[in-house]
Amino acid sequence: QLPHVADSLLLDQTEKIQKFIRIINRELDRRKKLLSEHGVGTIALYREVTGKQEPTMVILMDSYESMKDEPYETDLFKLFMRISREGLSIGVHLIITASRQNNLRAQLYSNFKHQLTLPQNDISEVRGIVGATPLASTMEDIKGRALMKRDEVDVVQFALPVAGDNDIQIINNLRDQ
């Protein structure tokens, strides 16, 4: 129902996920070829040179560890590796969530330019993501509060675009939008 969401996939939709992998690989190839044909190295330069707006794509994988032992795990991992290496320059971004940092393969995690952590029960999990910054141990447990590691570590606040006095009201208000 969200106009900016092309599709959503569930873990048990093996055929749909395999089709998604093929489609995204083709899209990555198409975008790389497009940039090459115009002699530019990034989607921003392509837009500047051609005046055309190639849309930005964001792919979200919630709970990375949940795909472990699924028949498509290897192919999906290869796709995520490719996006993490090539995606930024061609306008394809990858967001992956995991309950613990060590649930992500280091090979993939090392390609992430930005990392974000919400409050964790184990402070070492926070430090593993953002480093030994004092912010890691003083992070307030406020809904939507997070630490984001870019060049430096910043405190960020996320908010839902709806009002509500409790979680149920917020969820219902989100559904009504």
What does each model-found stretch correspond to?
Residues 68-70, 77-78, 114, 143-177:
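Conserved P-loop NTPase motor module
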Residues 124-150:
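Phosphate/diphosphate-binding loops
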Residues 45-47:
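Long, structured protein-protein interaction/assembly regions in large complexes
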